[in-house]
């Protein structure tokens, strides 16, 4: 009897101890969450979609599904700066009128603005890790090597485009139904990889799958982690679907790319030992080796970083352009006429030839104007407190987004809500405006590639690649909406991004082009 009482007392004490421990842990977790919870910035109106009772989780959900609507609400209701929450922190939103004032300011950091949003120190996020570790390296590869080699790589891109079109759209003269977004993504991934990794890997099915999926899973993985308590993220990453996929893709990318990097290094070292110049290269994997100059570089992470930056935004522009051709078939003929005239009167696919395709350039830019991939012109972290010209104080360590909100402004564009494929071609005809309205040009009124010191360094490559693909699509194929599909040419929102519904089907058929694009490409190469 006495023994039973002792056991009962021990059980009661254990339960009391366990209860006390659990309460303490929960109280500590609640305290940590409260203390670490981001606070709104003083002096900036907080814009929400659900009112003042919104929680962090509802902030995150609204940002994920309706981020652009949230920001547009603030822009329409307020004339100056305001703030929003994406669930993991607050951002000050600034209209584009502040863009020129901030675009090159030394105390405004792009890298620090995005670092905590993208978890570069977590496994699998290798592309972000290399980009944030040494942003100057990637920029040097793009600005110094890729941009200055556009004349060299244009023919390679045109040639690869013929292979990619054949592989994805085929040669059928009959109308066929296609998931056009997926086809365009495949084509962009292959051409981009031709410049990034060379001829062999750009057709490797496993690599193409990695490069297409890595960016999507990077952003999804970041979103998954942002919705977790900071204390739990190091553990929760191993249970998140997108994070798990990222680790698999990163490992596979290393298996494919590392041997190529080592082979390039050996060839360069052997040439130097023999007193010769290293072999000439025409892809970023070789240019990375040249630019590294003894620096510790994660070459695979660098390639994944380029994939994040290059593929999905270009796919979006081209997808929306094809949709516009289906909506406005009357603009197809003048575009085809220009492309044919230029290719017949020049030496085929070349940088000067692409420059002369001004209607095509204008068409793609007008697509961007009315259907931009994102409406954010700049992300920055304020490294030192700063007072704007109108007296607005940006606190130290605050994060800001400057909007690209002039794209439909009637003070900038005549009849701004109407699609005019030749709008920018006509603007370039004005004295002194020749170089101001090209697809790759940036300004505070048109910042789809960003603006200022941190504008997209690869925009000149992107513009040339977009024109090559679009020109080949126009000359080689006809497009139209499948009956009942026009209404599916809608956009799907994701944070500040809007993309075409990937389930959209379009009718495609091979046509007899005005000149043999394949022959022109081969003769130019």
Swiss-Prot record:
Gene Ontology, cellular component aspect: membrane
Broad EC category: oxidoreductase
Subcellular location: Membrane
One Pfam family this sequence matches: p450
Keywords: Glycoprotein, Heme, Iron, Membrane, Metal-binding, Monooxygenase, Oxidoreductase, Transmembrane, Transmembrane helix
Pathway(s): Mycotoxin biosynthesis
Enzyme Commission number, as recorded: 1.-.-.-
The keyword Oxidoreductase is annotated on this UniProt entry: yes
Cofactor: heme
PANTHER family: CYTOCHROME P450, CYTOCHROME P450 MONOOXYGENASE AUSG-RELATED
Reported function: Cytochrome P450 monooxygenase; part of the gene cluster that mediates the biosynthesis of the diterpene glucoside brassicicene C. In the first step of the brassicicene C biosynthesis, the bifunctional diterpene synthase bsc8 that possesses both prenyl transferase and terpene cyclase activity, converts isopentenyl diphosphate and dimethylallyl diphosphate into geranylgeranyl diphosphate (GGDP) that is further converted into fusicocca-2,10(14)-diene, the first precursor for brassicicene C.
The name this protein goes by in its record: Cytochrome P450 monooxygenase bsc2
Annotated organism of origin: Alternaria brassicicola
Classification of source organism: Eukaryota, Fungi, Dikarya, Ascomycota, Pezizomycotina
């Amino acid at each position: 009897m006495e023994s039973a009482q002792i056991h009962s007392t021990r059980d009661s004490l254990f339960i009391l101890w366990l209860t006390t421990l659990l309460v303490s842990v929960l109280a500590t977790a609640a305290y940590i969450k409260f203390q670490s919870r981001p606070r709104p910035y003083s002096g900036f109106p907080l814009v929400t979609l659900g009112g003042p009772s919104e929680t962090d989780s509802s902030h995150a959900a609204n940002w994920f599904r309706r981020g652009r609507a949230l920001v547009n609400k603030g822009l329409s209701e307020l004339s100056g700066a305001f703030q929003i929450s994406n669930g993991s922190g607050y951002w000050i939103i600034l209209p584009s009128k502040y863009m020129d004032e901030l675009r090159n300011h030394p105390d405004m950091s792009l890298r620090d603005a995005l670092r905590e949003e993208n978890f570069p120190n977590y496994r699998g996020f290798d592309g972000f890790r290399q980009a944030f570790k040494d942003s100057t390296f990637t920029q040097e590869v793009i600005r110094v090597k890729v941009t200055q080699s556009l004349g060299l790589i244009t023919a390679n891109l045109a040639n690869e485009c013929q292979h990619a079109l054949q592989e994805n759209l085929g040669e059928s003269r009959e109308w066929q139904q296609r998931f056009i977004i997926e086809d365009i993504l495949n084509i962009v991934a292959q051409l981009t990889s031709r410049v990034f990794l060379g001829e062999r890997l750009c057709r490797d099915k496993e690599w193409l799958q990695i490069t297409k999926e890595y960016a999507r899973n990077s952003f999804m993985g970041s979103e998954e982690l942002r919705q977790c308590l900071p204390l739990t993220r190091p553990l929760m990453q191993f249970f998140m679907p997108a994070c798990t996929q990222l680790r698999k893709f990163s490992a596979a990318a290393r298996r494919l790319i590392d041997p190529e990097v080592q082979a390039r290094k050996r060839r360069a070292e052997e040439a130097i030992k023999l007193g010769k110049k290293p072999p000439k290269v025409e892809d970023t994997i070789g240019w990375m080796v040249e630019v590294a100059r003894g620096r510790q570089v994660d070459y695979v992470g660098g390639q994944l970083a380029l994939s994040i930056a290059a593929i999905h935004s270009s796919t979006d522009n081209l997808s929306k352009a094809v949709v516009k051709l289906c909506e406005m078939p009357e603009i197809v003929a003048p575009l085809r006429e220009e492309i044919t005239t230029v290719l017949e009167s020049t030496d085929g696919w070349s940088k000067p030839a692409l420059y002369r395709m001004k209607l095509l350039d204008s068409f793609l830019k007008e697509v961007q104007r009315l259907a931009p991939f994102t409406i954010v012109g700049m992300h920055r972290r304020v490294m030192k407190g700063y007072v704007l010209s109108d007296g607005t104080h940006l606190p130290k360590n605050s994060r800001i987004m400057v909007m690209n909100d002039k794209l439909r402004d009637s003070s900038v564009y005549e009849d701004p809500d109407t699609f005019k494929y030749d709008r920018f071609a006509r603007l370039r005809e004005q004295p002194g405006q020749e170089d101001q309205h090209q697809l790759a040009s940036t300004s505070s009124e048109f910042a789809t590639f960003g603006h200022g010191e941190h504008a997209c360094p690869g925009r000149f490559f992107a513009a040339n690649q977009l024109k090559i693909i679009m020109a080949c699509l126009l000359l080689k194929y006809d497009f139209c909406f499948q009956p009942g599909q026009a209404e599916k040419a809608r956009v799907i929102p994701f944070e500040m991004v809007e993309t075409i519904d990937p389930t959209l089907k379009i009718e495609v058929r091979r046509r007899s082009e005005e000149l043999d694009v394949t022959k022109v490409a081969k003769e130019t190469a």
